[in-house]
Amino acid sequence: MSTTVTVLTDTWSHRAKRLEGDAKILAIGTATPANWVDQTTYPDFYFRITNSEHLLEHKEKFRRICNKSKIMKRHLVITEELLKKNPNLCTYNEASLNTRQDILVSEVPKLGKDAAMKAIKEWGRPISEITHLVFCTTSGVDMPGADFQLTKLLGLNSSVKRLMMYQQGCNAGAAMLRLAKDLAENNKGGRVLVVCSEVMLSVFRGPSLQQEDNLLAQCLFGDGAAAVIVGTEPRPGLETPLFELVSAAQTTIPDTDSYLKLQLREMGLTFHCSKAVPSLITQNVEDCLVKAFEPFGISDWNSIFWILHPGGNAILDGVEEKLGLEPEKLRASRDVLSQYGNLTSACVLFILDEVRKKSKKDEQMTTGEGLEWGVVFGFGPGLTIDTVVIRSVPIN
């Protein structure tokens, strides 16, 4: 099988110098549900609440998966009380889409609001200056969508230009940065609010002896929302840029569309992930890096800071080994995976927030761990790789 990467959209912007018109991230906010689970005890809870404690071998396998995940805890909307009220969520293959939808259409925008409010507070400008809203989720589908609900929750202008992105997968966080960059740079004076909100209730269900991928989903995904505000030409003294979005591209690995699949069924969103996914991503990341950084004369991957989507520990280990990265390069990605699990579209934005906060705490010279150039990587169904070249700003 060929693994040569094919560029689908967005040729690289060959601009080696900073342009005033380039989009900047002006604020970041994140939020999680108050409820959280300890990964070490989660197998006991999961098999008990799904009435599956008799599946002893399956439970021990799940425990091994959890122990190898390098995840310490995850925040979840799911509680024992919620599951007892809705037992159809706990049985594999039981029709439960209506129940899931009723919960998700409320919880997804609410969590998104919490993240958005934090970003807006950091931004420090009137909410009326938001001109565009992009909302992304893999959790639930509704019309009017979560974007519409969020405009009401935040009190945005009725004239705000909305875009709802459903079912995009784990590459979506990086893809939303690409989209926000395009919107900001083509709408002078525009301020784009991007919100990624994910609730893993869409994939929660009891174990299946026939579908072992389901156990990986139950171990891996967590709930969280992240928001960024993007615009060009920050107002001096009124707006403080955090990162510059320099260029962006999306690629797919040929003949891999069946390797990572999420499908909406009567029992909710099903999950399939081939064991070949980590190695396929690992084999193709460097080609994306070369295309991205060649215009800027950069080929030392340890000279940049990294925002790598932690789809799983195997992906982090594989990329680190393949590229010869120093251990600290993927520290932020590993930390977010450890504390939150895989947050799907919100994950890279959580990592971006972690990087800039730790850079300030450690008294680094820039928001990018003291370095100038960085990369955001998102991986998702397709197999799709989204790559965003970013530039840090000095920390005053």
UniProtKB/Swiss-Prot annotation:
Keywords: Acyltransferase, Flavonoid biosynthesis, Transferase
InterPro entries membership: Chalcone/stilbene_synt_C, Chalcone/stilbene_synt_N, Chalcone/stilbene_synthase_AS, Polyketide_synthase_type-III, Thiolase-like
EC number: 2.3.1.74
Catalysed reactions listed for this entry: (E)-4-coumaroyl-CoA + 3 malonyl-CoA + 3 H(+) = 2',4,4',6'-tetrahydroxychalcone + 3 CO2 + 4 CoA
Recorded metabolic or biological pathway in which this protein acts: Secondary metabolite biosynthesis; flavonoid biosynthesis
EC class of the enzyme, as a word: transferase
GO-annotated molecular function: naringenin-chalcone synthase activity
Biological processes annotated in GO: flavonoid biosynthetic process; polyketide biosynthetic process
UniProt keyword annotation of Zinc present: no
Family: Belongs to the thiolase-like superfamily. Chalcone/stilbene synthases family.
Function: The primary product of this enzyme is 4,2',4',6'-tetrahydroxychalcone (also termed naringenin-chalcone or chalcone) which can under specific conditions spontaneously isomerize into naringenin.
The protein's name: Chalcone synthase A
Gene from which this protein is expressed: CHSA
